[in-house]
């Protein structure tokens, strides 16, 4: 049975929109990682820069100081480690420590050395769709064009296709209506040769789905609905805050999909 990968979010920042300040010391971060592993996480995604709306950019030195001690403490755990960064210097420092994956929220567009660094360490990379929101073509077409172009550049740099993930970038450079369009057409991204990761957890899109004002934590069940929808559309991984809820749901959806496929093969 094909298992949907669960990526647990570990923000080691003071200002992330959902859990800023909770895990920005090594001891609390270690405890959170252990809990997420027990809850079913396949990947831990460590981020040292908040990308919430209105965030302030932190220096390279500050990002290093936030991320490296945590990565060094958890890299030996029995789980894949990803680092959420768009800076090749941070990526290389973490890859030297043994992380498995870089989650680049600018898909190599911010730092053109990123692909060479990831290829050098034979690691995986996630390319997330981003931008300034100004586009000359419909959102899905622009997303596909941009991500496939960057994936091609990643391959030229030496990263094999099976180590390149695509993320449609829900919550970034899109209106709520554009995000709904992207969700409805996820299968077009899945139809590419690359595995797809979906990251909707507690974002404003899930608030819109609720139809009324909510705190980020109150959006977990609706996040799980997007997980189920994404898996049915063919995504291979989901990036979430509430690992236990989404891991259980993904296990159930995976089973039902496998059962459906088996019945089709018999007919």
UniProtKB/Swiss-Prot annotation:
A Pfam family that this protein carries is Pterin_bind
In UniProt terms, what function does this protein have?
Catalyzes the condensation of para-aminobenzoate (pABA) with 6-hydroxymethyl-7,8-dihydropterin diphosphate (DHPt-PP) to form 7,8-dihydropteroate (H2Pte), the immediate precursor of folate derivatives.
Protein family membership: Belongs to the DHPS family.
Record-listed (7,8-dihydropterin-6-yl)methyl diphosphate binding positions: 84, 103, 167, 203, 239-241
Q: Name one GO biological process term.
A: tetrahydrofolate biosynthetic process
Q: In which pathway does it act?
A: Cofactor biosynthesis; tetrahydrofolate biosynthesis; 7,8-dihydrofolate from 2-amino-4-hydroxy-6-hydroxymethyl-7,8-dihydropteridine diphosphate and 4-aminobenzoate: step 1/2
Q: What is this protein identified as?
A: Dihydropteroate synthase
GO MF term set: dihydropteroate synthase activity; metal ion binding
On subunit structure and binding partners, the annotation says: Homodimer.
Task: Give the gene symbol.
Answer: folP
Tell me the enzyme class.
Answer: transferase
The UniProt annotation places Mg(2+) binding at 11
Where is the chain membrane-spanning?
none
- Name a GO CC annotation attached to this entry: cytosol
Secretion signal: which residues? none
Q: What is its EC number?
A: 2.5.1.15
Cofactor(s), names only, from the UniProt record = Mg(2+)
Keyword annotations for this protein? Folate biosynthesis, Magnesium, Metal-binding, Transferase
Per UniProt, residues of the Pterin-binding domain are 1-251
Enumerate the catalysed reactions: (7,8-dihydropterin-6-yl)methyl diphosphate + 4-aminobenzoate = 7,8-dihydropteroate + diphosphate
Against PANTHER family, the record matches this protein to: FOLATE SYNTHESIS PROTEINS, FOLIC ACID SYNTHESIS PROTEIN FOL1
């Amino acid at each position: 049975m094909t298992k949907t990968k669960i990526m647990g979010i570990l923000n080691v920042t003071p200002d992330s929109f959902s859990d800023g300040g909770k895990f920005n010391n090594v001891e609390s971060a270690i405890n959170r990682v252990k809990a997420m592993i027990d809850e079913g996480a396949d990947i831990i995604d460590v981020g040292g820069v908040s990308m919430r709306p209105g965030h302030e950019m932190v220096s390279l030195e500050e990002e290093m100081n936030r991320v490296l001690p945590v990565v060094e403490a958890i890299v030996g755990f029995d789980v894949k480690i990803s680092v959420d960064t768009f800076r090749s210097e941070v990526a290389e420092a973490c890859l030297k420590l043994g992380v498995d994956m870089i989650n680049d929220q600018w898909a190599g567009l911010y730092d053109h050395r990123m692909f060479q660094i990831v290829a050098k360490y034979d690691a995986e990379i996630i390319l997330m769709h981003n931008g300034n929101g100004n586009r000359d073509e419909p959102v899905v077409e622009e997303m596909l064009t941009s991500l496939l172009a960057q994936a091609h550049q990643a391959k030229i740099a030496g990263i094999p296709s099976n180590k390149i993930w695509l993320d449609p970038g829900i919550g970034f450079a899109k209106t709520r209506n554009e995000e709904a369009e992207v969700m409805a057409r996820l299968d077009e991204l899945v139809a590419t040769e690359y595995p797809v990761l979906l990251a909707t957890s507690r974002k404003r899109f899930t608030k819109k789905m609720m139809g009324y004002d909510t705190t980020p934590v109150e959006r977990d069940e609706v996040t799980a609905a997007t997980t189920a929808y994404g898996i049915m559309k063919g995504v291979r991984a989901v990036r979430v805050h509430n690992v236990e809820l989404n891991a259980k749901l993904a296990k159930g959806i995976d089973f039902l999909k496998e059962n459906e496929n088996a019945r089709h093969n018999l007919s």
